[in-house]
C-alpha cells in the first residue's frame, strides 16, 4: 500500500493544509509521498515538497498542472487541501478522471458541503435544524430579514477566513466587501447568544460512526482564524460537558446530515447549542489534522488513535 498526500493549495488555508500534512506524515502507517500545490497553482514534488512543508509555505511551485507524477505507483491519494480548489470537489474530480481511489467525500458531496448556502438549503429541506440565514451575491442589494447581530461569511471558505460579526446594519456593507474578497457569494447568518459551540467527528462511508462530542470555548468575539490555530487561544473540552441525551442528539443529527449530503470517508460536523436548541452549522469534509485540530482528538477520545484513524481512512477509500 502506497499513499500520495497532497497538501498546500491556492486557498487562504494554504498554511493550515501544510500544518495538517505534517501531522499526517508523522503518523500515517503506510509508505507515503508528499506533493505540495504552491500558492501560484504549480506543484512541488520530492525533496522540494518536503522543504515547503518544513517552511510551512510554498509561494511558488515548479510543475504546472497536471504534475509529472507516476500515478500508477499509488494505491490511494489523500487530498489534504482545505478550502476552494481542494475541498470543493475540484481535485476530487481530477482524481475521478484518473481512476484513483482517494480519501474523503466525492465530487458532489465536497462541492455541496463547501457551499454554506446550498448545504443549508439541503439540510433544512431534510429537517435538520440550521441557523436562519440569507445568501447575498456580489453586486446585488442585500436583503436581511432579521436584526443584528449577525455573521457575514464567504459562502465557500473555511477556517473562519473572511468572516465578520456585524452589530449594526450600517456595518453590513463593509462586512460584505470583506466576504466578497474571497467569494462571489456570501451568507448572512443570525448570531445566536448565548451560544455553545460543539463539534463531532464522523468516520465511514454513508453509514458513518460518530465520535464523542467536543466543545470549543474561547474569549474572542467569535471562533476566528487566529483563535483556531494559535495554541492557547481556545479551550477544547473532550468530551463536552453535556447530558447524555444532548450528546446522543448531536451524534444522531451529525450522522443524518452526513447521509443526507452524501459524504463518505470523514467529516467534522459543527453545531451551535443556544437556549436548549441545537443548530447544525456546517460539515467540513476535510477537517484539520494539526496538533490543535479537533477531529483526530475527538476520535482519540473515543479510543481510535491517530495512526489507526489514518489507517481506517485509507482503507475506506478502497471500499
Swiss-Prot record:
Subcellular location: Cytoplasm
GO biological process, one term: cell wall organization
Species for this entry: Thermus thermophilus (strain ATCC 27634 / DSM 579 / HB8)
Protein name, per record: D-alanine--D-alanine ligase
Cofactors named for this entry: Mg(2+); Mn(2+)
Binding residues for Mg(2+) 2: 282, 284
Note on how the cofactor is bound: Binds 2 magnesium or manganese ions per subunit.
Keyword terms: ATP-binding, Cell shape, Cell wall biogenesis/degradation, Cytoplasm, Ligase, Magnesium, Manganese, Metal-binding, Nucleotide-binding, Peptidoglycan synthesis
Gene name as annotated: ddl
Amino acid at each position: 500500500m502506497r499513499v500520495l498526500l497532497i497538501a498546500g493549495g491556492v486557498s487562504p488555508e494554504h498554511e493550515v493544509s501544510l500544518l495538517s500534512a505534517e501531522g499526517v506524515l508523522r503518523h500515517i502507517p503506510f509508505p507515503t509521498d508528499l506533493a505540495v500545490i504552491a500558492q501560484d497553482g504549480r506543484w512541488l514534488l520530492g525533496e522540494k515538497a518536503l522543504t515547503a512543508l518544513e517552511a510551512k509555505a510554498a509561494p511558488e511551485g515548479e510543475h504546472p498542472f497536471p504534475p509529472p507524477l507516476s500515478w500508477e505507483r499509488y494505491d490511494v491519494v489523500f487530498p489534504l487541501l482545505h478550502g476552494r480548489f481542494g475541498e470543493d470537489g475540484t481535485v476530487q474530480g481530477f482524481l475521478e478522471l484518473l481512476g484513483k481511489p482517494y480519501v474523503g467525500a466525492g465530487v458532489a458531496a465536497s462541492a455541496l458541503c463547501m457551499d454554506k448556502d446550498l448545504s443549508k438549503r439541503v439540510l433544512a429541506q431534510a429537517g435538520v435544524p440550521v441557523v436562519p440565514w440569507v445568501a447575498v451575491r456580489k453586486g446585488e442589494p442585500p436583503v436581511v430579514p432579521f436584526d443584528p447581530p449577525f455573521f457575514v461569511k464567504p459562502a465557500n471558505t473555511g477556517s473562519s477566513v473572511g468572516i465578520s460579526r456585524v452589530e449594526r446594519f450600517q456595518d453590513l456593507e463593509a462586512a460584505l466587501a470583506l466576504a466578497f474578497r474571497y467569494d462571489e457569494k456570501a451568507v448572512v447568518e443570525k448570531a445566536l447568544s448565548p451560544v455553545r459551540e460543539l463539534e463531532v467527528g464522523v468516520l465511514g462511508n454513508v453509514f458513518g460512526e460518530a465520535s464523542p462530542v467536543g466543545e470549543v470555548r474561547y474569549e474572542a468575539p467569535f471562533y476566528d482564524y487566529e483563535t483556531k490555530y494559535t495554541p492557547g487561544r481556545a479551550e477544547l473540552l473532550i468530551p463536552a460537558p453535556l447530558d447524555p441525551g444532548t450528546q446522543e442528539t448531536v451524534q444522531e443529527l451529525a450522522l443524518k446530515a452526513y447521509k443526507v449530503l452524501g459524504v463518505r470517508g470523514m467529516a467534522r460536523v459543527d453545531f451551535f447549542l443556544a437556549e436548549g436548541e441545537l443548530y447544525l452549522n456546517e460539515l467540513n469534509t476535510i477537517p484539520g489534522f494539526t496538533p490543535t485540530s479537533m477531529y483526530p482528538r475527538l476520535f482519540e477520545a473515543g479510543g481510535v488513535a491517530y495512526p489507526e484513524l489514518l489507517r481506517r481512512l485509507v482503507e475506506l477509500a478502497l471500499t
